[in-house]
């Protein structure tokens, strides 16, 4: 959090590599940064656009054209899907446009990113919060959306989706009917996790 605050206060960022499990908020953090500093930005989902030609063309066109802001930022989401050849091309582009363009790379598997790119970035592992925190977050979302729920159902959903926070939230959305969170009674919940979640939710008042 302290690093993010420094970046937001300074209005400047280095090249960043955000890595960690799916659903832990890497893309959300990247977009938070670009939306709160004075920059033009380009978002590329590298799992869909991962070839040498696409990476080179999109990145080069954006980085080399005149923008409205002094700084440009390129978010390459899921960049562990980029082919090794495309990563080599990306490394060269990062060097060529380093004066006016920053890169934020996100990935699940940092070992798939070539060393020359890793060495040019400040790397941060995004670690998921614990189950209790996820349960509290989900409870807050449901409360804000005026959705009625039973704490046992919160436990079920968290246990089924953790540590993927996105999966937890999406799972809850699918179970909401008429502003009520309803879980199939046949869903199995491990008692130890249920008790932990119930404990934190009972003390939220």
Where are the language model's segments positioned?
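A Lys-centered signature of the CheY-like receiver
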Residues: 127
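P-loop/Walker A NTP-binding region and its immediately flanking N-terminal helices
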Residues: 1-124, 132-133, 139, 143, ...
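AAA+ P-loop NTPase domains with strong preference for DNA replication initiators
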Residues: 140-205
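General structural signal for secondary-structure boundaries
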Residues: 1, 51, 130, 182-184, ...
